[in-house]
Curated annotation (Swiss-Prot):
The gene is hflD. This is High frequency lysogenization protein HflD homolog. The keyword Membrane applies. The keyword Ubl conjugation does not apply. It comes from Shewanella sp. (strain MR-4). It comes from the Bacteria. Keywords: Cell inner membrane, Cell membrane, Cytoplasm, Membrane. GO terms for cellular component: cytoplasm; plasma membrane.
């Protein structure tokens, strides 16, 4: 298996895994604690030696690979809403990587969260609120806001809002890694078959 393509597909799966949780939270107001932790933990791995260092929860990653097959494959599983969120995240990532001040602020704020984890779990409400505020303060202001659709009763709850923003930050982290590994939007069209084949092979590992 082409290692660069494997790593790039892993990062793309990470984006989709976080976005799918945003969609579920917005509709149902609930999240799977293990999946949430898996996505949020990716934010904190800022100097990985490999993509695998970022995605250590293999069960969560497998869900991401399945989403890659659903979104890029020819099946009826394609989800237009997830595609819309993906396009929004990739657009914001382009703006972030062009903003030196934004990247510096992001690094400093993530360091603060790492210090907070000496006392709290990654899924503690205080940590999630902190991650959400990083997204609001740094990412949201970069460009058009991503409009989240869902159940208004769920979306009104502060904890749901915080989790959604924290997961969008996780999606952004994976998008940054995907781009660093050579990912480009045109690959999602012209290299679709190679990405699908890599995701299928990765599901069997």
């Amino acid at each position: 298996m082409n290692e660069q393509l494997h790593n790039r597909t892993m990062a793309f799966a990470g984006i989709l895994q976080a976005i799918a949780q945003v969609q579920h939270l917005a509709r149902h107001g609930e999240s799977d604690t293990d999946e949430l932790a898996a996505s949020l933990n990716t934010i904190l791995v800022t100097n990985p030696e490999s993509a695998a260092d970022v995605y250590q929860d293999k069960a969560a990653l497998h869900k991401g690979y399945q989403l890659v097959l659903n979104q890029l494959g020819d099946s009826s599983q394609k989800d237009v809403e997830i595609t819309r969120y993906l396009v929004g995240i990739l657009a914001l990532e382009r703006k972030l990587t062009r903003s030196n001040s934004g990247l510096a602020m992001l690094a400093e704020r993530i360091n603060q969260v790492n210090r907070q984890l000496h006392h709290f779990a990654i899924t503690d409400e205080q940590v999630i609120a902190n991650l959400a505020s990083i997204y609001s303060d740094i990412i949201s202001n970069l460009g058009p806001k991503i409009q989240i659709s869902g159940n208004p009763l769920c979306l009104q709850r502060p904890i749901v809002q915080h989790k959604i923003r924290a997961l969008l930050l996780a999606a952004m982290r994976s998008a940054v890694l995907w781009r660093q590994l050579g990912g480009k939007r045109r690959h999602l069209v012209f290299a679709r078959k190679a990405i699908i084949d890599t995701a299928k092979k990765s599901l069997t590992l």
